[in-house]
Amino acid sequence: MRPLRAHRPALAVAGLVLGLALGTPALAPAQNNYEIQVYGSETVAPKTTMVELHSNTAVEGTRHTTDGVLRTQGAFHETLEITQGWTSWFETGFYTFTSVQPDPRYEWVGNHIRPRVRAPEDWHLPVGLSLSVEAGYQPRRFSTDTWTLEVRPIIDKQWGPWYVSVNPTLDRSLKGENSGKGFEFSPAVKVGYDLTSTVSVGLEYYGALGPIDNFDRPRDQQHQLFPVIDLNLGPKWEFNFGIGFGLTPSTDRIIVKMILGYRFDWGSGPAK
């Protein structure tokens, strides 16, 4: 992470982002199984654009249309994520979600926007710390909630070959079946270990527990574990592959996911 010359702008943006999130009226998990990722605290560098392709498919998932939402088993989900770094502490991500149904049909599934800020290095915190807010729309046939909001604190730390990241995410439905439930707790955690300078292995956990003031019954909660592999193909590349296993009846049983990313640099110079 690069040092920040002025702290007040970062604090102001973080406060504004969090304030907007907490002040927005009464979320179901936003875009389940389209972007399956535990975030690290680092933001994209200024004058850099990160392009990522998230590819996911449920090998064993829902087999029928349920509550008006299309089946997940056999559907191939493709998400294009483009993230632009503006300063050493601020980035904005844009998402386009698509799905290829078993018919086959290629369908647009929605768009999201995600601003994110992070604590600068010269704060000398013992952990990496950042905050993202993601909002967007998805058609009713893909989600019981059409407008959603996600507030994601990100805390991570590297100890030698070990890496841990915790995302205690809060989701909120702005319009749809769950709009009256308030914030719901959807934690994500990653533990990784560097086998070599090129290969890392790890375990990722994703959950959806329900409203923060009244968790769902255990069988209605969603819990997934993904053994994953990350490849360090160079400073411009990102690669992640995993196979996920659902642990409850409400979770897709087997999901395969892959993330492939590349950074485009548009110039160099100090961030302002």
Regions found by a protein language model. Name each.
Residues 12-25:
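Bacterial N-terminal signal peptides
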Residues 1-7:
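N-terminal secretory signal peptides that target proteins for export/translocation
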Residues 3, 28-29:
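Short linear motifs centered on Gly/Pro in flexible linkers and helix caps
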Residues 9, 13, 32-34:
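Generic short amphipathic/hydrophobic targeting helices enriched at N-termini
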Residues 29-272:
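Transmembrane beta-barrel domains of Gram-negative outer membranes and organellar outer membranes
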